Curated annotation (Swiss-Prot):
Function: Histones H3 and H4 chaperone involved in the nucleosome formation and heterochromatin silencing. Required for the deposition of H3K56ac-carrying H3-H4 complex onto newly-replicated DNA. Plays a role in the transcriptional regulation of the cell-cycle dependent histone genes by creating a repressive structure at the core histone gene promoter.
Subunit structure: Interacts with histones H3 and H4.
Pfam families assigned to the protein according to its UniProt record, in alphabetical order: PH_18, Rtt106_N, Rttp106-like_middle
Bias-annotated ranges (Acidic residues): 330-345, 352-398, 421-430, 442-459
Source organism, top-level taxon: Eukaryota
UniProt name for this protein: Histone chaperone RTT106
Length: 459
């Protein structure tokens, strides 16, 4: 196995190997694609390191600061506690976002009016006291790692009060959000707040827990965007980019969703709670996204010639074992012409001719079973031969008993060996020495003695 396959996720590796099994020469193409992507990634890392190095010498004067958040947890593009500033670049007087540590600039986004494409506040699913600030932007003409900041509501409220941006009695974090949004507008970009009451009244934003491959994350459904986060890579989709959606792997508890973009890319998100289906389906319908769950390409494919389906394989196995004939036996259905006749036989009241035919059939079946047993003796080991012989002896004894009963009553139904006339029973018992004389005396019912019972007294 080529080394690059080991670095792919399990699901992606299986897909690649499936294609390679059909087209062995394609492995070299996959290798080239992997190398190209790796070289591009290494180049991006080198560029980022160079840019971070060049910003180490920069500093932001206090008079150029428009707004700042001190000691907040930055998760991307860096991962550390930093002070985030919206300031004016001294070189060209354009607004910028600066990430500082001890008054040194570690990362900067220049000309935020053009570079910031989308920014929003998002709820932190596990903790109500935290909120995300997410920002998607371009750098040097390409999408860079998005900005993701975790804001502690109590900490931010405290900072705002210390700067006299809020009154001492204010405790609503929404006041901080509104202030930050106004400052962003002043510098040329907007921060949306889709989960605020005013927006929720007109558009229902929501989020669901899910998996992207082996990575657990959250899928946010916003008015004009869908975001998956927040483990890298963070994915952002514009609603208008989504061409279709499919639902799959539907179980009693969970289901999968696959987003298909207009350029044909597919992004599958799995293990979504069934309770969220109605919200997702309503969102899809409002955005007029096509549901391709029942499209021809997703339907079960017809087996190719030479291939045996699971159903036909099962059928073949049943035929070999003889089980299929038993399963397909005739039922005593009312529409069946033989319904009444078979029903009569079941209680032993059939005609004599039918009984004889059934008896012959019984004998034939016994003979067939004995023949099958004889054939099986050649294939079975010694233990199985002994068991077969015992079964044959039992069958012979049963057959002898049936013959005795049949001789006693030729018209008896084989399906019920004891369905004979009442007056024939004594003859049969006497023939086998089973009748003994029991002396009895009949009591005179005309005597005056009080008696109980049947009126028969035994000596």
């Amino acid at each position: 196995m080529p080394n690059f396959l080991e670095k792919l996720s399990e699901s992606l590796r299986e897909k690649v190997l499936h294609i390679v099994s059909k087209e062995p020469d394609s492995i070299s193409i996959f290798q080239e694609v992997y190398n190209c992507g790796k070289d591009s990634q290494d180049e991006d890392i080198d560029n980022k390191k160079r840019k971070l190095t060049t910003t180490d010498t920069l500093s932001v004067n206090d008079e150029n600061v428009v707004f700042e958040l001190q000691d907040v947890s930055v998760l991307s593009p860096l991962r550390k506690k930093l002070t985030v500033l919206i300031a004016v670049d001294e070189r060209d007087q354009s607004p910028m976002i600066s990430f500082n540590k001890n008054n040194n600039v570690e990362y900067v986004i220049n000309n935020i009016k053009q570079s910031v494409k989308f920014s929003t506040f998002l709820p932190f699913p596990e903790k109500k006291n935290l909120v995300y600030l997410y920002m998607n932007y371009e750098r040097d003409g390409s999408n860079a790692d998005p900005v993701l900041i975790t804001l502690n509501k109590e900490q931010i409220l405290k900072q705002f009060k210390e700067r006299n941006l809020l009154k001492a009695e204010d405790s609503d974090f929404q006041l901080c959000v509104d202030y930050m949004r106004r400052q962003a507008i002043l510098t040329g970009f907007r921060i949306s707040d889709p989960f605020s009451k005013s927006v929720m009244d007109s558009h229902h934003s929501f989020f669901v827990d899910c998996h992207r491959g082996s990575k657990e994350g959250t899928l946010f459904f916003l008015p004009e965007h869908i975001i998956f986060g927040f483990k890298k890579p963070i994915l952002l989709f514009e609603s208008k980019q989504i061409d279709a959606i499919t639902y799959s792997s539907i179980t009693r508890l969970t289901f999968n969703v696959t987003l298909i973009t207009k350029d044909g890319e597919r992004f599958e998100f799995s293990m979504i709670d069934q309770n969220k289906f109605s919200e997702i389906d309503e969102y899809v319908k409002k955005k007029q996204v096509e549901d391709k769950s029942m499209s021809d390409e997703l339907k079960a494919k017809t087996p190719k010639s030479g291939q045996t389906s699971d159903q036909s394989a099962l059928k073949e196995a049943l035929e070999e074992s003889g089980t299929l004939d038993t399963m397909n036996g005739e039922s005593d259905d009312e529409d069946d012409q033989n319904f009444e006749e078979e029903s009569d036989l079941s209680d032993g009241s059939g005609s004599g001719d039918d009984d004889e035919d059934d008896d012959d059939d019984d004998d034939d079946e016994d003979d067939d079973s004995i023949e099958k047993g004889d054939d099986g003796e050649e294939e079975e080991d010694d233990n199985e031969e002994e068991e077969q012989e015992e079964e044959e002896k039992e069958e012979q004894e049963q057959e002898q008993n049936r013959q005795i009963l049949n001789r006693a009553s030729p018209n008896a139904a084989p399906s019920n060996h004891f369905s004979m006339e009442i007056d024939e029973i004594p003859d049969l018992l006497d023939e086998n020495g089973l009748i003994q004389d029991i002396p009895i005396t009949m009591d005179d019912d005309n005597d005056e003695e009080e008696e109980e019972g049947s009126g028969v007294e035994y000596d």
